[in-house]
Amino acid sequence: MPSDGRECVSIHIGQAGAQIGNACWELYCIEHGLDEAGFLKEEEKNKKQQSLQAFFSESMNGKHVPRAIYVDLEPTVLDEIRNGVYGNLFHPDQIINGKEDAANNYARGHYTIGKELIDVVLDRIRKQTENCEGLQGFLVFHSFGGGTGSGFSSLLMERLSVEFGKKSKLEFSVYPAPQVSTSVVEPYNSILTTHTTLELSDCSFMVDNEAIYDLCRQKLHVERPSYSNLNRLIAQVVSSITASLRFDGALNVDLNEFQTNLVPYPRIHFPLATYAPVISADRAHHEPLSVQDITHMCFEKANQMVKCDPSAGKYMAVCLLYRGDVVPKDVNAAISSVKAKRGINFVDWCPTGFKVGINYQAPITVEGGDLAKVHRAVCMLSNTTAIAEAWARLDHKFDLMYSKRAFVHWFVGEGMEEGEFMEARDDLAALEKDYAEVSRDTADLEEENDEF
């Protein structure tokens, strides 16, 4: 089957990356009619197969293998994949683990333990890319807070930039939640990894566990959400973002278009993701949702994947990715009604700011999952200055610990220089300033320039 040369290689790093990866590949297989081993199901064989090639390579015997690499510095999570339902989907070479973990320590992931694994990982990634006709880029899944997710990811991004200079690198990052913390040193790891990858990543979609946890509890009525509930919801967002590479649509968006439309300045590349409708299976029949309904839902704080307040910031760009039973006329009407609403503010140098994608493939859900099957859904990616609030929160936590030099010896003991902490923190202070700068009105800036 000829490829149209829009392949993407997914790289899943650490526990968060691997477990989100599981949820994504489970969903992709269902969307494309593949069984657990990657073969087309009988009823799918006569249908026209849409561009599976972007995410799967096909072997001689008709097996579809994900273009993906899983990496963790210790084996537990990856062993679960090897022995799990989709264990046969991947070639053993695609799943790579070390012997000891990064112990929540950026320096272990980036310097000591990570160094031992990086060449093997790059070699396997190279093999994946040699199998592509026209590689579009890489999707990197990881968390900011873990040692592997932060340290190894930034090491890998550095090496990918050297080896595949011009290829897009998009990140899906789990940002530390405001209230729920998985480790004390999350603020250190997050700020160190953000500093290292800030100049290397083209676009970084952030999700935070607390926001998704609340979505599962409040909208899906799951009393005690587990990581698998959270990850299935994240997978729907990832699927919406990548659907245009995998299916036909009226207005398709490829990887480079995301950057062009969402990233006004290279450093300001952290769009906020919102997905609608998030409704549970038992409520779906009572709520037929129009294009206008789901579009308005995207602008509600409760549907966001990161805790921040968009009404306190300004939008620089908005990308609306619809899928299912949606026609452009309805979308235009919905956008007009959104623009008329108060409390949705755009920066004055980018007054229009809406990019739309429509994909005819209806949203598909996992059997026995929490989400209802619906006829249409939308994923909104918005670059808003409000996300600066998330950085400010993190910087504050960093400052509290660093003022006492708490836990710093663990990092320095793994070969890091203490100077790196301040260098990273200064870079994030500059990032906060960048956000403040773009949200100021052009008129104010012109007045200041006149004074000089």
Swiss-Prot record:
Coiled coil: none annotated. One of its GO terms (molecular function) is GTP binding. It comes from Caenorhabditis elegans. The active site is at E257. The keyword Transmembrane does not apply. GTP binds at Q15, E74, S143, G147, T148, T182, N209, N231. Mg(2+) binds at E74. Dimer of alpha and beta chains. A typical microtubule is a hollow water-filled tube with an outer diameter of 25 nm and an inner diameter of 15 nM. Alpha-beta heterodimers associate head-to-tail to form protofilaments running lengthwise along the microtubule wall with the beta-tubulin subunit facing the microtubule plus end conferring a structural polarity. Microtubules usually have 13 protofilaments but different protofilament numbers can be found in some organisms and specialized cells. Tubulin is the major constituent of microtubules, a cylinder consisting of laterally associated linear protofilaments composed of alpha- and beta-tubulin heterodimers. Microtubules grow by the addition of GTP-tubulin dimers to the microtubule end, where a stabilizing cap forms. Below the cap, tubulin dimers are in GDP-bound state, owing to GTPase activity of alpha-tubulin. GO terms for biological process: microtubule cytoskeleton organization; mitotic cell cycle. Its main location: cytoplasm. Belongs to the tubulin family. It catalyses: GTP + H2O = GDP + phosphate + H(+). It is found in: Cytoplasm, Cytoskeleton. One of its GO terms (cellular component) is cytoplasm. InterPro entries: Alpha_tubulin, Tub_FtsZ_C, Tubulin, Tubulin/FtsZ-like_C, Tubulin/FtsZ_2-layer-sand-dom, Tubulin/FtsZ_GTPase_sf, Tubulin_C, Tubulin_CS. Pfam families: Tubulin (PF00091), Tubulin_C (PF03953). It is an enzyme of class 3 (hydrolase). Its cofactor is Mg(2+). Keywords: Cytoplasm, Cytoskeleton, GTP-binding, Hydrolase, Magnesium, Metal-binding, Microtubule, Nucleotide-binding. The keyword Nucleotide-binding applies. This is Tubulin alpha-8 chain.
